Structures are given as C-alpha cells and as structure tokens.
From Swiss-Prot:
Cellular component, GO, one term: nucleus
Subcellular location, record wording: Nucleus
InterPro entries: CBF_beta, CBF_bsu_sf
Species, as recorded: Drosophila melanogaster (Fruit fly)
Domain of life: Eukaryota
Protein name: Protein big brother
Pfam family for this entry, one: CBF_beta
Purpose of the protein: Regulates the DNA-binding properties of Runt.
Similarity-based family: Belongs to the CBF-beta family.
Gene Ontology MF annotations: transcription coactivator activity
Encoding gene per record: Bgb
Amino acid sequence: MMNEAALANMIPYDTIGLYEQPKPRFIFKMPRVVPDQKSKFESDELFRRLSRESEVRYTGYRERSIEERQVRFMNGCREGHTEASFVASGTNLQLVFNANQNPYLHDKECDFDKEHGKVHIKSYFIMNGVCVRFRGWIDLERLDGVGCLEYDERRAMHEDAILRDQIDRYNQRLREFEDTKRAYRDNRQDEMEAVRRGVASGGIGVGASMWRR
C-alpha cells in the first residue's frame, strides 16, 4: 500500500487544453467550531450530561502501581497536562493547561494550594465544535474527584469571529471563481461563433484561400 504521507504530498497531473475550463484555485478549510455554539452546548445530550458536576478519574498509566501513578499524575500536572475521564459517560479528555504556580496569579489553571491534598484544574479546548472549559479537582492520593464542562463564552466569541471571516473569504473567492467561469463561457461562445462564421464563408481566416486552390 502506498504510504499515506506520500499520498498527502502528491499533486494531480492536469494538462490544460485550449478550451479547458479553469480549475478552482481554493479549498474551504474545515471550520473549528459550529455556527451556533451556545445552542449546541445547551441542547446536545452529551454536553448536558457533562455540564453537571460528576465523578472524574485520572486515566493515565493504568497498568502501573498506585504509587507510581500518583507521582506521574503530579508530574504531568506540573508540566501542564493530564488525562481524565468522566466516569458516568466514559468520556475521556486530554487536558492541557498553564501550570504556572506563581502565587500572585488570581486564576490559576493548575492550583495545588487551593485545597490540601487536591489539585484544582481548568482547561480550555474545543469539543465537538464548541468552545468549553473543564473545571474540577482531583485527589492526589485517590486520583479521582469531581469535574464538569462549562461553556466558554469569551473563546466562543473569538472563534465565531474567525468562522465568520473564513466564510466571508470563502464566499468572496467563490464569487470570483464564478465570475471567471462566466467570462470563460462567454469567450468560448464568441470563439465558437467566429469559427462558425469562418466555415460559412468558405474557410477559416487566411487558410481559406489555400483550400480553394
């Protein structure tokens, strides 16, 4: 089987003929978010379940001893990442956050000091086309805790602006392509009409006299 990476770099071999229709020179990039994020967050059954506080567990290194898992969990948090799962739904999350432990920060994303024996975590990401925030805590010994997903209004507005701009640019390029295609079609009709007139007069251009000799 051909290597997928090689396939990704392959370019179709197209030869453009005299009257071949011009190809579109743009690709619509898949958007990161859906058009109405808040509505989906409030109506989607999965989001409705995950928006309620429920049990979460650390899921990393399950085959290792509890002592080693505790160490790896704390080290991962200090590096700014961890793995967690909502027990009731089985939804697994790869959480990434700012692990800065500056005591003067008022809104830490990873806070070992807020409550003894626990780490409080906030992580921002896009899930199923919706900007959300994980908020919860995990016990440093048991490696379980409580968490939920919240709708991230600020980042949703930012991503929505990007989406609108992306759609506007796509529509503009689509209009430009349609104009080019229309101009090509009009030129093709003019050329074909010129050919028909040349044939009706007994030849095409200068070459007509050659055929009459």
